[in-house]
Amino acid sequence: MKAKLILALLCLFLFSIHALDATAQTRRGRVRRSTSAAITTPSGLTYLISKKGTGPQLKAGDTAIMHYTGLLTNGMKFDSSYDRNQPFAFKLGAGKVIKGFDEGLAKLRVGDHAILVIPGKLAYGPKGIPNVIPPDATLIFVIEVVDVKSETVTGRPS
């Protein structure tokens, strides 16, 4: 009886290992497929649009309205508009945010969900933000473009 129980447990164990390995291979395949769609710009910014939006393309001068979560490469969250229950808005191209935000958001449209990987030189550089973001840290932003306010010909927001 003990031998049958041990044999059954051994078979179950081997089956579990095989199932876990197949799951891991599937996940790796998904990651490979999704990261192959990532684009790296000449400046070093990498972006991946995980869900395509159907709204207008963002452009310099627009006020981009978005939700985001900012992460360090170790996975630690340092900021999130979701935590404040308030989307973040900024004028694209005005230099009021880190360079990687200006460059990355200009690649997106309303409704896009994207991941931006922003090298330190396009983020907070060698100074970082003490006790929050280390010097020259690469930052990861998970973004959802919620809306845009475009300037009209008169220069006033529409």
Q: What positions do the PLM features span?
A:
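Cross-family detector of peptidyl-prolyl cis-trans isomerase
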Residues: K2-S158
